[in-house]
């Protein structure tokens, strides 16, 4: 047995150790054969011989298990070395990912308004008629509803056509002052070179008690915002109509492609329409129970901004997943 103990101590791997175990405790092992011969002995001799065999087996098992544990730990350490990650290795064939141009544009817009202490508010994509239309001064008989082709589930539920319902939900849940933006996906039944059935908007709302908010405040914020997004551009406000603001305006910037000189993109006017805005209509305040307040609202299409920032001619290409296009925005 001493010979086997010495062999165990010299073992350098688990396979050799297992071979020793089989030679001792296997079906034809030395100790196994010894236990088999017990039946040939008389009672007293059997008892004495069995005690010796068990003692040797115990000594062997103790040496075997100790060595097995050591070799198993060494094998584990070796596997860990082989499997370890080399954090200094760089495979140039693997490229890093990048934000989609719509998401990077959305992030830039949000970043600006967060710096002005605007909160980010969210609402459901599936809306009801009250929040999406009626509370925004668009009753069922209002002709302005024809301006939007809507995805209806039934008479009461629809896919929101704008993020303006988030403004209504926020005003119903909070008291003034409110400074918020509502970024998110919206849906309209439209699909062409400048429209897709799903797109993204960022709408903003500011409401203060009393008559503290004026169109001049709105104009100042939007002019600074547009120059933050597009650089040194000219900004103009044109009178327009929106059911939920009065007065209302469309906002244009000097064409970022031709620097205002006139080109095919701006239809040779030198101007590009980028967003709508206005002073919140008093009728909207009636729906949310506000009194003696003033405020302004604005809304913009994120895809429109992304197209202008990255000079993308077809809006639909933003949603086709073409890697040749997306790789340009790394």
From Swiss-Prot:
Its cofactor is Mg(2+). PROSITE patterns: AA_TRNA_LIGASE_II. Its EC number is 6.1.1.20. One of its GO terms (molecular function) is phenylalanine-tRNA ligase activity. It holds the Pfam family tRNA-synt_2d. Its main location: cytoplasm. The keyword ATP-binding applies. CDD domains: PheRS_alpha_core (cd00496). One of its GO terms (biological process) is phenylalanyl-tRNA aminoacylation. Binds 2 magnesium ions per tetramer. It is found in: Cytoplasm. Mg(2+) binds at residue 246. Keywords: Aminoacyl-tRNA synthetase, ATP-binding, Cytoplasm, Ligase, Magnesium, Metal-binding, Nucleotide-binding, Protein biosynthesis. Tetramer of two alpha and two beta subunits. Belongs to the class-II aminoacyl-tRNA synthetase family. Phe-tRNA synthetase alpha subunit type 1 subfamily. NCBIfam families: pheS. This is Phenylalanine--tRNA ligase alpha subunit. The lineage of its organism: Bacteria, Pseudomonadati, Campylobacterota, Epsilonproteobacteria, Campylobacterales. The gene is pheS.
């Amino acid at each position: 047995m001493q010979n086997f103990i010495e062999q165990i101590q010299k073992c350098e791997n688990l396979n050799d150790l297992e071979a020793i175990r089989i030679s001792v405790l296997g079906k034809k092992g030395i100790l196994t054969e010894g236990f088999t011969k017990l039946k040939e002995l008389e009672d007293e001799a059997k008892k004495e011989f069995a005690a010796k065999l068990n003692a040797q087996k115990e000594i062997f098992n103790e040496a075997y298990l100790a060595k097995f544990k050591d070799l198993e730990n060494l094998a584990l350490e070796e596997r860990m070395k082989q499997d370890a990650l080399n954090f200094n290795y760089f495979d140039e064939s693997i490229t890093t990912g990048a934000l989609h141009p719509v998401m990077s544009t959305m992030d830039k817009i949000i970043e600006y308004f967060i710096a002005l202490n605007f909160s980010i508010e969210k609402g459901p994509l599936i809306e009801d008629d009250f929040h999406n239309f009626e509370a925004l001064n668009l009753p069922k008989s209002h002709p302005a509803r024809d301006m939007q082709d809507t995805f209806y589930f039934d008479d009461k539920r629809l896919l929101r056509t704008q993020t303006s319902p988030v403004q209504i939900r926020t005003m119903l849940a909070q008291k003034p002052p409110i400074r918020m933006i509502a970024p998110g996906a919206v849906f309209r039944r439209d699909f062409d070179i400048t429209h897709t059935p799903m797109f993204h908007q960022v709408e903003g709302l500011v409401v203060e008690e009393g008559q503290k908010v004026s169109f001049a405040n709105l104009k100042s914020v939007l002019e600074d915002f547009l120059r933050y997004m597009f650089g040194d551009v000219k900004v103009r406000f044109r009178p327009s109509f929106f059911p939920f603001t009065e007065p209302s305006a469309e906002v244009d910037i000097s064409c970022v492609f031709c620097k205002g000189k006139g080109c095919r993109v701006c239809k040779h006017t030198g101007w590009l329409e980028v967003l709508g805005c206005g002073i919140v209509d008093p009728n909207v305040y009636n729906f949310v129970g506000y009194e003696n307040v003033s405020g302004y609202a604005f809304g913009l299409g994120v895809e429109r901004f992304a197209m202008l920032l990255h000079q993308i001619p077809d809006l639909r290409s933003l949603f086709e997943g073409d890697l040749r296009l997306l790789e340009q925005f790394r």
